[in-house]
Amino acid sequence: MKKKYTDFICEKIRVVPEGIPIYTRQLAEKIAVAYQLSKREASAATAVAVKRVMDKGVMPELRCYQKGVYYRTAATPFGEIGINKEQLIADKYLLPDIGYETGLTVLYKIGLTSQMPRERILATNVAKGCMRTDRKLDVIIRPPKTIITAKNKDYLQVLDMLELVEKAPIDEKHPFEVLADYTKRRNSNI
């Protein structure tokens, strides 16, 4: 006899480290394979099972971040562990090869400027039309100049940095050497 959907879901959730996002669509895919269900049936079964887990308090450490996104928490001396927002940003806007970080944040990270930028800008295929702010994740997303792929992602990021070098307050005496070193480290053949 197979496990109940709720037990299956709890088993899958328990192996996820605290703070890491848990997506119901991924749980549904696992249920579909394990129980040989259609995608639609698996989604419905997952929704019901997760709701039961939350309502009955089967896993008191499970928290809902937003519809379809959950995470496990743990108590620390500083309060509860929250969701890993960096992972959420990567899953939503950057992976798999659909976006990259741009703006002054990248220049700061590679050491071209000492100014810590106020905003974090991502170029992503998810952005349609114009620049907008995701207030929940505290990032600005903008559409790329061309569709981002695995092959052109690094090139586009370097081109954005070259464009920014002309406008940004640069502290480095030889910014183009720093950019060249950065591209070599990234194994880009630029």
Question: Model features per residue range: what roles?
Answer:
Residues T73-A75, L104, P144:
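Histidine- and/or cysteine-centered catalytic micro-motif in compact active-site loops
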Residues D134-D138:
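Conserved N-terminal entry element of GNAT/NAT acetyltransferase domains
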Residues M1-K92:
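Short beta-edge/loop segments at beta->alpha junctions of small alpha/beta modules
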Residues S43-A47, P96-E101, N152:
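Alpha-helix initiation and capping sites
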Residues I140-I190:
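Hydrophobic alpha-helical interaction segments
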Residues E61-V69, K92-T133:
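Short gly/ser-rich loop at a beta-strand->alpha-helix junction or flexible surface loop bordering the NTP-binding
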